[in-house]
């Protein structure tokens, strides 16, 4: 089948069962296809000799119930008379000898790395939001303040959903916040942040590097112990992905992609301070977070197995309720140094959909796209 793509091949007069003393050529002959995607069918011809018909088995025979079943059907429909890069991919698949390997190869080809683009972006947003919260809750000594938070951390996201890759990540960056007390009730601020986040997909050589810039406008009102807060945030992340396919013969195909993700968020919170001690207070609160995220269409470059990924967007409507316990302690009676901390419990519920299903297409074969695995709801 190498170099050609037909669904049926005929090998004529392969065996002659009537040959006297012919060893394996004598009597009945057992025939088995080496390729898992072809069936070998022996047929006795008019001369009493054995012809072998090699018949293609559909790829989706091996993927029923799998998330990449639609992908398998798409490339099966384009098998006949394929040429160029498409033929190179089919030639590789035709040499696979067992079902586990054909399933693994089809799953790698389909592009599971791109199933959770938005999930990775939300991890970046979470790091920046935590840094902003720390600055906003630090005490202002004057009416105009500039605060800086140096960001360094790591995390891990584990996925139990088939076709969605788990990953570890490291983040470094900085966030600066300038606040101005316009009146004793109203504080206005703006912020600028940058992070570099490196994602490493588990059990693969796939990597995603993201450079993120965030701008923010912030308003806080305080009236009789009540606190009203609004944060309007805009972000853009510049992603560079490296994706690798490891074939059954240990050869690798490497692809690269560049794309941008854009996001907007509005954080709104109302809370009430209750002093329960000189340096301790309880803050029950309720909030509403609104968000929107989108990424553009993009294509990989590199090997024949390169993908094209469809644009996608997502939105968030997330109400929340909770309580925080905040405390501080001065280090010495004359010291200006303090230790501050807070602990809390809260509940939030996502009414939107921040993990809309992604779609991709194998550029050399698919005219359209196939659906990637659906990430689990938060």
Model regions and ranges:
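Extracellular, surface-exposed repeat/solenoid domains
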Residues: 1-97
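Conserved small-residue
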Residues: 52, 148, 219, 284, ...
């Amino acid at each position: 089948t190498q170099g050609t793509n037909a669904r049926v091949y005929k090998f004529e007069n392969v065996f002659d069962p009537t040959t006297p003393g012919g060893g394996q050529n004598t009597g009945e002959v057992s025939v088995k296809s080496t390729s898992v995607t072809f069936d070998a069918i022996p047929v006795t011809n008019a001369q009493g000799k054995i012809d072998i018909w090699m018949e293609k088995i559909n790829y989706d025979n091996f993927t029923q119930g799998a998330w990449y079943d639609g992908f398998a059907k798409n490339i099966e429909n384009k098998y006949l008379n394929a040429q160029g890069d498409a033929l190179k991919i089919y030639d590789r698949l035709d040499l696979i000898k067992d079902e586990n390997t054909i399933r693994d190869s089809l799953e790698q080809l389909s592009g599971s790395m791109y199933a959770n683009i938005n999930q990775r972006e939300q991890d970046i947003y979470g790091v920046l939001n935590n840094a902003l919260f720390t600055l906003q809750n630090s005490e202002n000594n004057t009416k105009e303040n500039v605060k800086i938070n140096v960001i360094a951390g790591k995390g891990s996201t584990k996925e139990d959903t088939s076709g969605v890759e788990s990953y570890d990540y490291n983040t470094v960056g900085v966030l600066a916040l300038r606040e101005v007390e316009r009146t004793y009730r109203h504080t206005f601020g703006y912020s600028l942040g940058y992070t570099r986040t490196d994602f490493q997909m588990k059990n693969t050589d796939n990597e995603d590097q993201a450079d993120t810039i965030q701008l923010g406008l912030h308003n806080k009102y305080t009236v009789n112990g009540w606190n009203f807060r609004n944060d309007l945030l805009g972000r853009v992340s510049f992603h560079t992905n490296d994706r690798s396919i490891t074939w059954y013969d240990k050869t690798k195909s490497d692809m690269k992609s560049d794309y941008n993700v854009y996001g907007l968020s509005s954080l709104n919170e109302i809370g009430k301070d209750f002093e329960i001690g000189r340096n301790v207070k309880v803050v029950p609160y309720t909030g509403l977070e609104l968000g929107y995220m989108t990424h553009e269409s993009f294509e990989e470059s590199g090997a024949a197995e390169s993908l094209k990924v469809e644009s996608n967007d997502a939105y968030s409507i997330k109400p929340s309720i909770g309580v925080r316990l905040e405390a501080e302690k001065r280090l010495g009676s004359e010291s200006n140094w303090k230790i501050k901390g807070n602990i809390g419990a809260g509940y939030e519920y996502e009414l939107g959909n921040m993990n809309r299903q992604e779609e991709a297409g194998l550029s050399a074969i698919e005219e359209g796209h196939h659906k990637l695995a659906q990430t689990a709801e938060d």
